[in-house]
Amino acid sequence: MNLSFSSPPLLAELEVGHHLYWHLGKFTVHGQVLIASWIAIALILTVVILGTRQLQREPAGLQNFVEYALEFVQSIARAQIGEKNFRPWVPYVGTLFLFIFVSNWMGNLFPWKLIPLPEGELASPTNDINTTAGLALLTSIMYFVAGISKRGLSYFKKYIEPTPILLPINVLEDFTKPLSLSFRLFGNILAEELVIAVLVLLVPLFIPVPVMVLFLFTGAIQALIFSTLSAAYIGEALEGHGGGDHRD
């Protein structure tokens, strides 16, 4: 009697760090990250446009969802930046939250395998360090914009207080705080997608589903943490080092 066994799945088939490179002049970019980012942005814009196309006094359907999302983002900005200063920063905080939230969920829900690429494969934009570092750099820029818009060039006096010796440390602190957020987001999302990929290879039926549900929850939490702390840094810049009363 002949017994034949199918070969076990090869974990070596999982590719990490394999990219589709686009050459734009003198620059080389990760093409699959841009494609995935465009998909995330398109999804967000589609929902927002459809939800606000015909506004009703009594919201329903997508309008209700969009208004709830707006109120949620406003509550984050108000709590971290303060009642007096939060409104101009709602678009930025909301954009951060929605982009990270949708990107994280896309990593678990979107059928990336259905979109073949010449090299590499599509995945969540936030599992690439370039995306998360770019978001951190953007938050750092907004941090300085907030401080300068509030107090002008006198904002930079805080870097030599209480003594000029602390100048390098104070400058480094303002860049490392959002940068630490980028590494946390990148590490969590990359680990989640690798775990799901391994489970799908080993047990491809129902066992990965509860894990995917858990990762949907943690993806939402990561978006909340990044946007909340970004708003907190902006609030700190508006009130100065030491926190002040920006949450009152």
UniProtKB/Swiss-Prot annotation:
Matching entries from InterPro entries are given as: ATP_syn_F0_a_bact/chloroplast, ATP_synth_F0_asu, ATP_synth_F0_asu_AS, F0_ATP_A_sf
Q: Does the keyword Iron-sulfur apply?
A: no
Give the transmembrane ranges: 31-51, 90-110, 129-149, 195-215, 216-236
As one GO molecular function, the record gives:
proton-transporting ATP synthase activity, rotational mechanism
Gene3D superfamilies in the cross-refs? ATP synthase, F0 complex, subunit A
Q: What is its main location?
A: membrane
Keywords of the record: ATP synthesis, CF(0), Hydrogen ion transport, Ion transport, Membrane, Thylakoid, Transmembrane, Transmembrane helix, Transport
Q: Where in the cell is it found?
A: Cellular thylakoid membrane
Membrane-protein topology: Multi-pass membrane protein
The keyword Cytoplasm is assigned to this record: no
Q: Which GO terms describe its cellular component?
A: plasma membrane-derived thylakoid membrane; proton-transporting ATP synthase complex
Supply the HAMAP family for this chain.
Answer: ATP_synth_a_bact
Q: What does this protein do?
A: Key component of the proton channel; it plays a direct role in the translocation of protons across the membrane.
Indicate the quaternary assembly: F-type ATPases have 2 components, CF(1) - the catalytic core - and CF(0) - the membrane proton channel. CF(1) has five subunits: alpha(3), beta(3), gamma(1), delta(1), epsilon(1). CF(0) has four main subunits: a, b, b' and c.
Q: Which family does it belong to?
A: Belongs to the ATPase A chain family.
Identify this protein by name.
Answer: ATP synthase subunit a
Q: Which organism is it from?
A: Synechococcus sp. (strain JA-2-3B'a(2-13)) (Cyanobacteria bacterium Yellowstone B-Prime)
